[in-house]
């Protein structure tokens, strides 16, 4: 950086030195030749008058007021340099029962500025398995999550899991006690049946309100859930208990937000709003809800508002194996 600045400074010094020599030579000649003096003054006055004249442009018609905000057209071309992934449940394709539905959706997105080669429609079997290995590989990722009251899956916890990066380590509760050290430190449990019980311990490793040798005295935090983000009192050791054959639990640290991921809840009585959750950073705007209709109507709505959704997101700025976030050790 410094070598470039020195080079520019040297060029400027040489330029001004040469300009001074030329000016001195011209003044010397003008002093000896009145005709040359008159010619130089005439050219100077002619050029100066053009510099201060009003420039109306050439062949540029002016209509209406010039005090108009000009929109930034570069935003309209975002699809030309970005990839878009839309993740949908298997039941969507089953209900639409149309072999050409993907082609139809991509053609509709083309009208919104997204080339067909930049759009990927990815199917997942169920939310629990998808959240376990999400494969969020596009510049922009939109997840359609259908609400099901019969599913033992908390949509707000699913949103928190997918909208943030996590660094996790496996927990061996048969050998060790565990404690959470900060607000961003959580335990994430996944499986077909996660019933988590804990017993808080004092400094002598004796149970607080429970017996470490009697699981029935443990405090039950979750019951038969498929996904649970568990928050206990920071700085206190806990002895945990769960059924290893139907559930896994990991000690995780919540990292930065995945700003290139958005979740759309399809149906359900409430809108996903994890900003109300004290466990997460507030003001998350990348989660919303669409009233449940037919899946064709859902996709039409997504296509119609695709660029509005994208504006609430940020393009992926670095290479990251997002699918491995839950299994990193």
Curated annotation (Swiss-Prot):
Glycosylated residues, chain numbering: 72, 150, 241, 321
Record's GO cellular component terms: host cell endoplasmic reticulum lumen; T=13 icosahedral viral capsid; viral outer capsid
Subcellular localization: Virion; Host endoplasmic reticulum lumen
Keyword tags: Calcium, Capsid protein, Disulfide bond, Glycoprotein, Host endoplasmic reticulum, Host-virus interaction, Metal-binding, Outer capsid protein, Signal, T=13 icosahedral capsid protein, Virion
One Gene Ontology term of the molecular function aspect: metal ion binding
Residues binding Ca(2+) 2, per UniProt: 180, 231-232, 234, 304
Residue ranges of the region described as CNP motif: 168-170
Binding site for Ca(2+) 1: 98, 209, 217, 219
InterPro entries in alphabetical order: VP7 (IPR001963), VP7_1 (IPR042207), VP7_2 (IPR042210)
Domain of life assignment: Viruses
Post-translational modification summary for this protein: N-glycosylated. The N-terminus is blocked possibly by pyroglutamic acid.
Entries under Pfam families matching the protein: VP7
Cystine pairs: 85-138, 168-252, 194-247, 199-210
Entry function: Calcium-binding protein that interacts with rotavirus cell receptors once the initial attachment by VP4 has been achieved. Rotavirus attachment and entry into the host cell probably involves multiple sequential contacts between the outer capsid proteins VP4 and VP7, and the cell receptors. Following entry into the host cell, low intracellular or intravesicular Ca(2+) concentration probably causes the calcium-stabilized VP7 trimers to dissociate from the virion. This step is probably necessary for the membrane-disrupting entry step and the release of VP4, which is locked onto the virion by VP7.
UniProt miscellaneous comment: Some rotavirus strains are neuraminidase-sensitive and require sialic acid to attach to the cell surface. Some rotavirus strains are integrin-dependent. Some rotavirus strains depend on ganglioside for their entry into the host cell. Hsp70 also seems to be involved in the entry of some strains. In group A rotaviruses, VP7 defines the G serotype.
Subunit structure: Homotrimer; disulfide-linked. 2 Ca(2+) ions bound at each subunit interface in the trimer hold the trimer together. Interacts with the intermediate capsid protein VP6. Interacts with the outer capsid protein VP5*.
Identification of the protein by name: Outer capsid glycoprotein VP7
Species annotation: Rotavirus A (strain RVA/Turkey/Ireland/Ty-1/1978/G7P[17])
High-level lineage: Viruses, Riboviria, Orthornavirae, Duplornaviricota, Resentoviricetes
